[in-house]
Amino acid sequence: MATSKSGGSSKNGRDSISKRLGVKRSGGQFVKAGEIIVRQRGTKFHKGKNVGLGRDYTIFALSSGKVEFKTLKGRKYVSIV
C-alpha cells in the first residue's frame, strides 16, 4: 500500500513552436532575386510586379530592386521597383 497519496496529472505543459511568419524585408529595402519578402498564411499580402507567390503563400523577389508596399481597394500589394 502506498504511504503517500498519488498526485493528479496536469493537463497543461504543451506549446507549439513559432512559425516565424511576417515581413522579412521592409519597404524601400534593396533585395536580390530569390530573397523572401513576406512569409504568411493565406494572402494577407498580394503579389505585385516582379514578385512570385509560393505554394505556402510566401512572397519572394523575382528580380533585384527595392521593395514597395502599397494598398489598393483594401488589399496590400508587394512589388519590386
From Swiss-Prot:
InterPro entries: Ribosomal_bL27 (IPR001684), Ribosomal_bL27_CS (IPR018261)
A single GO molecular function term of this UniProt record: structural constituent of ribosome
Positions of region (Disordered): 1-20
Keyword list, A-Z: Ribonucleoprotein, Ribosomal protein
A Pfam family hit: Ribosomal_L27
Disulfide bonds: none
Domain of life: Bacteria
Feature: compositional bias, Polar residues: 1-11
One term under GO cellular component: cytosolic large ribosomal subunit
UniProt similarity note: Belongs to the bacterial ribosomal protein bL27 family.
Protein's name in the database: Large ribosomal subunit protein bL27
Protein species of origin: Borreliella burgdorferi (strain ATCC 35210 / DSM 4680 / CIP 102532 / B31) (Borrelia burgdorferi)
